[in-house]
C-alpha cells in the first residue's frame, strides 16, 4: 500500500538506500571491540546500545519514516510479531520502527522500538505498515555484562536502583564493548568500559549483580531469567528515556571533532542531492560520546547528582507555579462570588422594604384565597383518599361471599368414578368381563344422575348470576379508579395493615379539621373585638391592647391549620400511602377474581350437568342400536353385487359379435346410476359411523366390544377415513401413466368430482402404519376446520384381493408448482398468496406434530393461481425415509444442511424446503449462487425487502422460526395494492386460461372414450 499510495514520495527519497544497513547488521564480529552508545536500560546487567557507526543510518530511517508513516493506513487484521511496523511514539509524536511483543486487548499492543530498545503500549491506530525497503534488522543491539547476573532473590527496590545505576554509567554515553559471546536469543555478552572504568566491576561492587558460575561449554553465565512480559511491563513504568524527547526523529546531535566534520560533509552532500535533513535543537551532543577515557567514576557520580538535583528543583518550581496559578484563580472566583452576594443582598433588602409596606394586605389576600379553596373542599367527600371505596369493597366481599356448593364435591367424586368405569369398559377385551363392567357403569349412572339433580337444584336456589353481576360491577368501578393492578401474594396481613392505616389517617384528618375550625373561630372573634374598638358609635371604654393582642400568632396558627388541611385534601399521597392502597387494591381484586372464577367453574359445571341430564335420560339403562348401520351395509352389498353383474353384462355385450349399441348405452346409464347409489350409501354409512363414534367416545365405549362385526374400532382409529365398503373394481378408473412413476395412480369421477386413487403396496405391519399416518394427517386437516392449507383425503380403503391400500384424494390437473411455472410463472403477488397458503399447511401439520419431510414443487398446488395447499406424502414411509430423498428444484437442493449431516428431520427442515421454493418462485429462471454448504445466496437477487428478510431467516441465518411466525411475516401481511393493468400480461393469461380449458375438455373426451372402450393414448 505504501509503494502504491506514495510513489511520488518514494521517488523523492530514492537516494536513501538501506542495503548497506542490512549488510552491516549481518556482519557479526566476535572477539572485537565496538564503540557504542547506550540507548535503553533493562536491568542492572542488560541494556540496549547503538553502534557509533550507525548514526547516519538512524538519520535516514527517521527521514523516511517521517514521510511514509503519516500517509500510511493503520494495520488491519492480525498483527505479525515477526514483522516490522511504524509506531507513533507518545512522547515526541514521531515515528519509529517497532515490533509487536504482545496483544494486550483488541485496541492496544505492547511494542518494542527496535532501533532503540525501549517499549511502549500503543493503540492499533498508532501502528502502520512500512515498505519492504524499511524491513531490515534493528540498529540497536541487546547487550549483557559479561560474567554477571542478577540474584534470584533480589528485591524490587534494589532491582530498580541497579537499573538506575547502570543507566548513569551507560545511558547516552560512548562505551567500548569487548564481545565475549552471543546467546541463543541474539543478546551480545560483552565487557563494557567507559574510559578506564570497568562498568561490570562497578555494578558488582554496588551489589546490584553477582558473578556467574562458569558453564561447561561457554563463559555464558547461568541465570534465572525474568519473565519477558514482567520485565517489559516493569520497564514501561520506568521514566521515559531522554531519546524519546528528541524532535525530527534524530538520535544523536552533530558530532564534535572529526566525526562532526565528517557528518557535516555527508549531510551537505545529501542536501545538494535534494534530500534536506535537519537536526533538532534538543539533540544529544555526540561530543558526549567522546568523553575522555580518564574521566573518574567520582566525576560521573557528581554529574549524576547534579542532574538529579536540577530535575528535583525543576519539579518543585513547576509545582509552586501550578499552586500559584490555582490560588490566583481561586481568589478571582471568591471575588466574583462576593460581588454576586453583595448584589443579592441589595436585591433582598429592596424586596423586604417593598414587602413590609404591603405585608398585611398580601397575607390577608393569601389567606382569603386559601379559604375559598377550603370551602370547596369541605363540600367534596375526600374519604376516597383514605380507601373508603376499598373498605366498601371488602365489606361486599365478606358479606355475600359465594362458597362452593356442598353438592359439587360429591358430584366431582361420583363423576370421577363414572369416568373411571367408562375407561375400564373401553380397555376391556372380553365380552363377559365387559358385561360386568357395563352393569357397574349403569349403576354408577343412576348415582350420577341423582347427584346431578341435587347439584342443579342447589345452584338454582342460589343467586349465582346476581352475585356475579355484583362482583363484575365492583371490579369495573375499582379498575376505573385505580387502573391496572399489580400481581402480589395473597395475604391477610395486607388487609390488617390497611385497616390500621385507614384508622390513623381518619384520626389525623379529624384532628386537623378540628384545629382549623378552632383557629378560624379565634380569628373571627378577634375581628369582632377589633370592630368594636374602631366603632365610634359603641359607648364604653374598651382597651385596644386586649383586642390587638397576639394577632400575628392568630394569623400564623390559622394559616398553618388551613394549609395542613389543604395538604391532606389536595397534595398527592406519599409513596408509603400509595403502596398500602395499591397492595390493598390488588388484594381486593384478587379476591374478586377468585370468586368470579369459582362462580364460572360452578356455572360451567351447571351447564354440563344440564346437558348431561338431558342426554342421560335418553340413554339411561339403554344401549344404542347398530341395526341401521347393518341395514346400510346390507343395501351396499346388494348394490355392489348388482353393479358387478351389470359390469359383466356390459362386457359381454361389448364382446359379442353383433353388439347392440342402444342396449349397451342403457346398461352404461344403469351402471352410472348404480355407482352413484353405491357412493350415496357409503356416505350414509359414514354418517352412521360418525354417530356411533360420538356415542362410543362419550357414552358407550362398549360398542366396539359388543359389535366387532361393524369394525367401529378400525374406523375410529383411522379418524373416520377408512371405509370397508369401497372396492377398486367398483370405480370407472383410468390409469394415469404419466404420474405413475412411483406408485399406481388412476383417475376417476365420484359424484361429479374428479379424484385420484393412489395405490400403496402393504403388508401386515405396513398396513397398520399407513392407516395410523393417514389418520393423523386426516385429523389435522379436520381440526383446522376448512382453513388447513392441506390436500384433503376423501377415503382410505384396503383391497381384498391384493396387498394394496388405496387413498382417494381430489385431482387438480396441472396445478402443482412445477406445471404452473412451466406454463405461465406466478407473478410476485400470486406467489405470496400461494406461499401463504403453503405456510398455513405447514403450520397445520407442525401443530399436530407431523413433519412433512417431502415438500417439493410437485406436491405443492396453486389452485386458481392464488390458493396454495400442501400435498400429502407417502404414508408407507417414515419421516426419516421421506426426508432422505434429495429433491431438487432446478439446481437448488431442497434438503436442509442438517439433513445432509445425518440429523433427523424437523419442522426447521420443512421450512428450509419452503424457503427454497419461495426463492425459486421469486427469482424464476435466474441462476443460483450456492455456497460450500449448499445454501443459496439471497443477497444477489433484487427482491422486496420483506420477502428477502423472510428468505434470509429461512435459508441463510437458519433462525428458529416456526410456521406460525412465517404465516405472520410482514410480506404476507401487506395490504392489497391496486395492481397496474398490463394488457400484454392480461392477454397472455387469457390465452393460458383458454389453453387450459381446451386441455381439460380434451381430457374429459378422452375419459369418455375410455368408458366407451374407444380409448387411445393420442388424446
UniProtKB/Swiss-Prot annotation:
Positions of the Protein kinase domain: 710-1019
Give the Enzyme Commission number: 2.7.11.1
One Pfam short name: TUDOR
Q: What start-end ranges are recorded for coiled-coil regions in this protein?
A: 298-355
Q: In which tissues is it expressed?
A: Testis specific.
Q: Which reaction does it catalyse?
A: L-seryl-[protein] + ATP = O-phospho-L-seryl-[protein] + ADP + H(+); L-threonyl-[protein] + ATP = O-phospho-L-threonyl-[protein] + ADP + H(+)
Keywords recorded for this protein, A-Z: ATP-binding, Coiled coil, Kinase, Nucleotide-binding, Serine/threonine-protein kinase, Transferase
Which residues of this UniProt protein bind ATP? 716-724, 737
Q: Which domain of life is it from?
A: Eukaryota
Listed SMART domains: S_TKc, TUDOR
The Gene Ontology CC terms held by the record are:
acrosomal vesicle
- Tudor domain: which residues? 78-137
User: A GO molecular function for this record?
Assistant: protein serine kinase activity
The UniProt similarity line reads: Belongs to the protein kinase superfamily. Ser/Thr protein kinase family.
Per its record, how is this protein called by name?
Serine/threonine-protein kinase 31
Species for this entry: Homo sapiens (Human)
Q: The organism's lineage?
A: Eukaryota, Metazoa, Chordata, Craniata, Vertebrata
Q: Which gene encodes it?
A: STK31
Amino acid at each position: 500500500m505504501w509503494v502504491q499510495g506514495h510513489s511520488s514520495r518514494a521517488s523523492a527519497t530514492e537516494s536513501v538506500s538501506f542495503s548497506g544497513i542490512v549488510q552491516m547488521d549481518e556482519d557479526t564480529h566476535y572477539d572485537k571491540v565496538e564503540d557504542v552508545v547506550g540507548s535503553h536500560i533493562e536491568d542492572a546487567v542488560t541494556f540496549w546500545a547503538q553502534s557509533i557507526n550507525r548514526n547516519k543510518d538512524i538519520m535516514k530511517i527517521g527521514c523516511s519514516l517521517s514521510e511514509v508513516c503519516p500517509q500510511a493506513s493503520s494495520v488491519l487484521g492480525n498483527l505479525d510479531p515477526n514483522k516490522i511496523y511504524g509506531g507513533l511514539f507518545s512522547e515526541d509524536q514521531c515515528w519509529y520502527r517497532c515490533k509487536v511483543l504482545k496483544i494486550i486487548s483488541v485496541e492496544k499492543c505492547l511494542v518494542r522500538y527496535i532501533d532503540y530498545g525501549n517499549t511502549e503500549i500503543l493503540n492499533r491506530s498508532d501502528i502502520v505498515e512500512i515498505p519492504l525497503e524499511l524491513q531490515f534488522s534493528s540498529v540497536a543491539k541487546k547487550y549483557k555484562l559479561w560474567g554477571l547476573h542478577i540474584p534470584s532473590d533480589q528485591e524490587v527496590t534494589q532491582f530498580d536502583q541497579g537499573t538506575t545505576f547502570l543507566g548513569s554509567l551507560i545511558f547516552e554515553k560512548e562505551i567500548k564493548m569487548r564481545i565475549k559471546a552471543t546467546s541463543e536469543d541474539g543478546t551480545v555478552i560483552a565487557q563494557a568500559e567507559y574510559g578506564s572504568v570497568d562498568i561490570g566491576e562497578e555494578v558488582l561492587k554496588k551489589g546490584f549483580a553477582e558473578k556467574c558460575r562458569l558453564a561447561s561449554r561457554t563463559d555464558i553465565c547461568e541465570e534465572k531469567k525474568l519473565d519477558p512480559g514482567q520485565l517489559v511491563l516493569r520497564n514501561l513504568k520506568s521514566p521515559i528515556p531522554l531519546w524519546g524527547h528528541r524532535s525530527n526523529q534524530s538520535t544523536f546531535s552533530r558530532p564534535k571533532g572529526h566525526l562532526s566534520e565528517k557528518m557535516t560533509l555527508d549531510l551537505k552532500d545529501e542536501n545538494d542531492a535534494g534530500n534536506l535533513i535537519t537536526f533538532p535543537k534538543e539533540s544529544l551532543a555526540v561530543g558526549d560520546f567522546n568523553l575522555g577515557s580518564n574521566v573518574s567514576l567520582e566525576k560521573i557520580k557528581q554529574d549524576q547528582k547534579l542532574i538529579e538535583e536540577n530535575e528535583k528543583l525543576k519539579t518543585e518550581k513547576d509545582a509552586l507555579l501550578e499552586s500559584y496559578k490555582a490560588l490566583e484563580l481561586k481568589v478571582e472566583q471568591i471575588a466574583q462570588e462576593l460581588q454576586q452576594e453583595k448584589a443579592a443582598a441589595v436585591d433582598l433588602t429592596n424586596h423586604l422594604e417593598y414587602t413590609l409596606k404591603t405585608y398585611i394586605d398580601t397575607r390577608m389576600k393569601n389567606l382569603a384565597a386559601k379559604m375559598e379553596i377550603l370551602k370547596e373542599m369541605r363540600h367534596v367527600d375526600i374519604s376516597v383518599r383514605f380507601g373508603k371505596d376499598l373498605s366498601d369493597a371488602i365489606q361486599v366481599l365478606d358479606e355475600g361471599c359465594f362458597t362452593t356448593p356442598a353438592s359439587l364435591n360429591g358430584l366431582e367424586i361420583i363423576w370421577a368414578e363414572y369416568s373411571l368405569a367408562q375407561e375400564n369398559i373401553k380397555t376391556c377385551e372380553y365380552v363377559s368381563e365387559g358385561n360386568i363392567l357395563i352393569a357397574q357403569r349403569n349403576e354408577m349412572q343412576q348415582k350420577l344422575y341423582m347427584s346431578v339433580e341435587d347439584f342443579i337444584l342447589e345452584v338454582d336456589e342460589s343467586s349465582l348470576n346476581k352475585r356475579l353481576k355484583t362482583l363484575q360491577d365492583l371490579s369495573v368501578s375499582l379498575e376505573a379508579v385505580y387502573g391496572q393492578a399489580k400481581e402480589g401474594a395473597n395475604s391477610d396481613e395486607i388487609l390488617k395493615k390497611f385497616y390500621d392505616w385507614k384508622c390513623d389517617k381518619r384520626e389525623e384528618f379529624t384532628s386537623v379539621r378540628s384545629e382549623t375550625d378552632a383557629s378560624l373561630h379565634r380569628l373571627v372573634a378577634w375581628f369582632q373585638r377589633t370592630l368594636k374598638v374602631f366603632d365610634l358609635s359603641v359607648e364604653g371604654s374598651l382597651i385596644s391592647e386586649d383586642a390587638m393582642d397576639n394577632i400575628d400568632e392568630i394569623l400564623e396558627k390559622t394559616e398553618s391549620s388551613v394549609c395542613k388541611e389543604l395538604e391532606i385534601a389536595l397534595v398527592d399521597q406519599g409513596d408509603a400511602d400509595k403502596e398500602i392502597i395499591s397492595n390493598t387494591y390488588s388484594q381486593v381484586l384478587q379476591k374478586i377474581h377468585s370468586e368470579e372464577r369459582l362462580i364460572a367453574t360452578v356455572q360451567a359445571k351447571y351447564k354440563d350437568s344440564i346437558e348431561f341430564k338431558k342426554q342421560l335420560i335418553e340413554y339411561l339403562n339403554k344401549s344404542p342400536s347398530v341395526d341401521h348401520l347393518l341395514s346400510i351395509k346390507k343395501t351396499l352389498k346388494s348394490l355392489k353385487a348388482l353393479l358387478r353383474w351389470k359390469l359383466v353384462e356390459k362386457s359381454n355385450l361389448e364382446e359379442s359379435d353383433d353388439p347392440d349399441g342402444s342396449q349397451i348405452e342403457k346398461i352404461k346409464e344403469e351402471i352410472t346410476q348404480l355407482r352413484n347409489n353405491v357412493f350415496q350409501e357409503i356416505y350414509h354409512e359414514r354418517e352412521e359411523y360418525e354417530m356411533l363414534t360420538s356415542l362410543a367416545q362419550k357414552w358407550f365405549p362398549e360398542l366396539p366390544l359388543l359389535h366387532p362385526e361393524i369394525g367401529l374400532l378400525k374406523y375410529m382409529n383411522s379418524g373416520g377415513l377408512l371405509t370397508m365398503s369401497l372396492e377398486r373394481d367398483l370405480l370407472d378408473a383410468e390409469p394415469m401413466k404419466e404420474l405413475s412413476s412411483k406408485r399406481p395412480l388412476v383417475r376417476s369421477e365420484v359424484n361429479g368430482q374428479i379424484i385420484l386413487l393412489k395405490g400403496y403396496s402393504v403388508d401386515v405391519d405396513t398396513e397398520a402404519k399407513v392407516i395410523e399416518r393417514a389418520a393423523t394427517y386426516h385429523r389435522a386437516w379436520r381440526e383446522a376446520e376448512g382453513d388447513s392449507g392441506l390436500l384433503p383425503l376423501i377415503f382410505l380403503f384396503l383391497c381384498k384381493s391384493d396387498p394394496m391400500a388405496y387413498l382417494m384424494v381430489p385431482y387438480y390437473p396441472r396445478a402443482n408448482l412445477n406445471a404452473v411455472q412451466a406454463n405461465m410463472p406466478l407473478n410476485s403477488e400470486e406467489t405470496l398468496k400461494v406461499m401463504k397458503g403453503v405456510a398455513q399447511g405447514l403450520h397445520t401439520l407442525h401443530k399436530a406434530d407431523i413433519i412433512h419431510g417431502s415438500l417439493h414443487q410437485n406436491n405443492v398446488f396453486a389452485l386458481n393461481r392464488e390458493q396454495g395447499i400442501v400435498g400429502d406424502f407417502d404414508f408407507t414411509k417414515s419421516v426419516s425415509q421421506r426426508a432422505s430423498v434429495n429433491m431438487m428444484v432446478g439446481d437448488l437442493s431442497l434438503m436442509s444442511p442438517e439433513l445432509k449431516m445425518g440429523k433427523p428431520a424437523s419442522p426447521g427442515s420443512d421450512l428450509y424446503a419452503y424457503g427454497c421454493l419461495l426463492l425459486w418462485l421469486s427469482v424464476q429462471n435466474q441462476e443460483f449462487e450456492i455456497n460450500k454448504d449448499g445454501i443459496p445466496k439471497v443477497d444477489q437477487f433484487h427482491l422486496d425487502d420483506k420477502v428477502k428478510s423472510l428468505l434470509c431467516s429461512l435459508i441463510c441465518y437458519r433462525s428458529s422460526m416456526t410456521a406460525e411466525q412465517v404465516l405472520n411475516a410482514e410480506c404476507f401481511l401487506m395490504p392489497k395494492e391496486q395492481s397496474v393493468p398490463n394488457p400484454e400480461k392480461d392477454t397472455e393469461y387469457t390465452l393460458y386460461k383458454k389453453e387450459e380449458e381446451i386441455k381439460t375438455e380434451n381430457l374429459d373426451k378422452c375419459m369418455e372414450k375410455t368408458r366407451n372402450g374407444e380409448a387411445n393414448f393420442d388424446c
